Amino acid sequence: MASQLTDAFARKFYYLRLSITDVCNFRCTYCLPNGYKPGAVNNNGFLSVDEVRRVTRAFSALGTEKVRLTGGEPSLRRDFTEIIAAVRENPAIRQIAVTTNGYRLARDVERWRDAGLTAINVSVDSLDARQFHAITGQDKFHQVMDGIDAAFAAGFDKVKVNTVLMRDVNHHQLDTFLAWIQPRRIQLRFIELMETGEGSDLFRRHHLSGMVLRDELLRRGWIHQIRQRSDGPAQVFCHPDYAGEIGLIMPYEKDFCATCNRLRVSSVGKLHLCLFGEGGVDLRDLMAEDRQQAALEARIAEALTHKKQTHFLHQGNTGITQNLSYIGG
């Protein structure tokens, strides 16, 4: 086995975010307000099941133990269950997660579980059905809520819910969210609105630092938890009176990048060292056959030597990320 992926700043990488499509059926104001427009896909289309199997096998040989399937909306893939099963074949991958808008969750969550899915993140930016519709462009709030209930019924011990924190949209609804998670094992993660190439105006209007919520949680007696090595970037808080937890993802906070442990592969097979980096390294030509695995591992390891110490969001440089559906946020 090759050595653990480590960059020039001694950061170790245990976590792969793998986009399997950039298509999404929602039109969220902060991501795809005008809906999905085909652009990134060439004649080869999105990664096949076999390509997913090969690239995750290569990453696991380099120490990856967690894979998150993202999009776009990953459940739009007709072969999504097969993709989960292909990743599950590899015993070195301990966690297989999905980030979904939740609209197919109630229908399919049991099949995903049986295929090997171990964790679920659902995007919910408001607990008000009308506001949910306004943000997403889809009147599917109750369908998504039913999906979260179905995930618990299917045996998932915890469900993570992602909420993009937006000034004058949902930042004043903390009490509503806290009441929702008090009896439920939901980790509610507030994600700071991030500037993208297509979203600069929205960012200027609605960005709010997660530190505002952090200070309020600490004032109310919430306790900051210790992070595990394959966890995502959230600072997680718990409270003895709540079954749920709160996570804060604050990419503009000082030293956010110091604990980076994740790499990204796009739905067309490009390795992205940072969500807000440039270009990407093409891996797809080395995913065609099993015998290419050593070369694929070598290209991944070499690419990591070029990973920067930090993103440049503070300078307004959003890199190649025009919207968050492109490489899965």
From Swiss-Prot:
CDD domains: Radical_SAM, Twitch_MoaA. Residues 8-234 form the Radical SAM core domain. It comes from the Bacteria. GO terms for molecular function: 4 iron, 4 sulfur cluster binding; cyclic pyranopterin monophosphate synthase activity; GTP 3',8'-cyclase activity; GTP binding; metal ion binding; S-adenosyl-L-methionine binding. The gene is moaA. It comes from Klebsiella pneumoniae subsp. pneumoniae (strain ATCC 700721 / MGH 78578). InterPro entries: Aldolase_TIM, Elp3/MiaA/NifB-like_rSAM, MoaA, MoaA_NifB_PqqE_Fe-S-bd_CS, MoaA_twitch, MoCo_biosynth_MoaA/MoaC, rSAM. This is GTP 3',8-cyclase. The keyword GTP-binding applies. Binds 2 [4Fe-4S] clusters. Binds 1 [4Fe-4S] cluster coordinated with 3 cysteines and an exchangeable S-adenosyl-L-methionine and 1 [4Fe-4S] cluster coordinated with 3 cysteines and the GTP-derived substrate.
